[in-house]
Structure formats: C-alpha cells, structure tokens
Curated annotation (Swiss-Prot):
Top-level class of the enzyme under EC nomenclature: hydrolase
GO MF annotation terms: metal ion binding; threonine-type endopeptidase activity
Gene Ontology terms: biological process: proteolysis involved in protein catabolic process
Cellular component per GO, a single term: proteasome core complex
Name listed for the protein in its UniProt record: ATP-dependent protease subunit HslV
Activation and inhibition: Allosterically activated by HslU binding.
Alphabetized UniProt keyword annotations: Allosteric enzyme, Cytoplasm, Hydrolase, Metal-binding, Protease, Sodium, Threonine protease
Annotated family: Belongs to the peptidase T1B family. HslV subfamily.
Complex formation: A double ring-shaped homohexamer of HslV is capped on each side by a ring-shaped HslU homohexamer. The assembly of the HslU/HslV complex is dependent on binding of ATP.
Organism listed in the record: Cupriavidus metallidurans (strain ATCC 43123 / DSM 2839 / NBRC 102507 / CH34) (Ralstonia metallidurans)
Residues annotated to bind Na(+): 162, 165, 168
Reaction(s) this enzyme catalyzes, per UniProt: ATP-dependent cleavage of peptide bonds with broad specificity
C-alpha cells in the first residue's frame, strides 16, 4: 500500500508572538488526495498551537494523546511533550506511528519526534515535513533580514516551500498567539 506523503509545518517566534502554519495538501503516491487538510490547530482552550506532519491517522492519534497529556499536566507544554515522547518511544504500538509534531504556547516552541526527541528549536524557528527545510531556510532569512511579524514570516516561508516542494501546496492555515 502506498504511503500518504508530505506537508510543511513551520513555526516562528519573535518577541512575544508566535505563529504556526501549515499547508493543506495530502498526497497518496503521485495523486493529490486533498488540498484543504487542516494540519494546524488550537488546543487546550486555545492556549496551545500544534501542527503535524506525516501519516494523517498517526498524527491524529498523537494529537489526541498530546491533548490528554496537556490536561494531565495542566497546560505545562514541556512536561506534556516529554511524557508523550517517552510513551511514543517506549510503547510498542506507538513506536510504529509515523508523524512529527510542532507545539507552541505563549512561551515555548517544541518539536516532538517518534525517536523520543523533544527539541527546543534555535532562533525561534522550527519546521517539519517534506518542505520543512525550504520553509526553515526561508523563515531564517526573513527573521534575520526583515522586521516582519511571525505570521507574515510563516506565510512567506510556506509560499516558498510550496513553490519548491511537490508535496506542499499554497492553501495555508496559520494560527498565532500573543
């Protein structure tokens, strides 16, 4: 069976603002199955942003677990992320899940991987997915050379990724926190 491929998720933190955005394309083999998927969401009463890349079903499973961890730790993003990563790495069924998450609250941005990694990105920029390297490079250049707010940086970075990565489109969902 073919795998679902691709997406681009990027987060930019500047000053007291953070933006997290993603494209809407879901690809199966060489066919675009959907162009309007919503891979960026607000959770925990709108206080936490989360974006996911990888297998859609796996990502939703992880998203549900992450929300439960946030409730358990009363919104403490770091503790919830570390606990999820620990479960993800040690649980035999979870270990097979193929997805990555970027999470952000008003203070912290984290990348959570299936290897058990919880990464605090340097420079306030994080990106995952098939177009992640393009988006991260573009965001880094924009942050270092402009005064654009995070939402605009995310939009421009996603646009560049969409022009270069065949698994990324230009139908964006961007969420922000101040």
């Amino acid at each position: 069976m073919e795998q679902y491929h691709g997406t681009t998720i990027v987060s930019v933190r500047r000053g007291n603002q953070v933006a997290l955005g993603g494209d809407g394309q879901v690809t199966l083999g060489n066919i675009v199955m959907k162009g309007t998927a919503r891979k960026v969401r607000r959770i925990y009463n709108g206080k936490v942003l989360v974006g996911f890349a990888g297998s859609t079903a796996d990502a939703f499973s992880l998203l549900d677990r992450f929300e439960a961890k946030l409730e358990k730790y009363q919104g403490n993003l770091t503790r919830a992320a570390v606990d999820l990563a620990k479960d993800w790495r040690s649980d035999r069924a979870l270990r097979r899940l193929e997805a990555m998450l970027i999470t952000a609250d008003k203070d912290t941005t984290l990348v959570i991987t299936g290897n058990g990694d919880v990464l605090d990105p340097e420079g306030g920029i994080a990106a995952i997915g098939s177009g992640g390297a393009y988006a991260q490079s573009a965001a880094k250049a924009l942050v270092e050379n402009t005064e654009l707010p995070p939402k605009d940086v995310v939009e421009k970075a996603l646009t560049i990724a969409g022009e270069l990565c065949i698994y990324t489109n230009t139908n964006f969902v961007i969420e922000t926190l101040d």
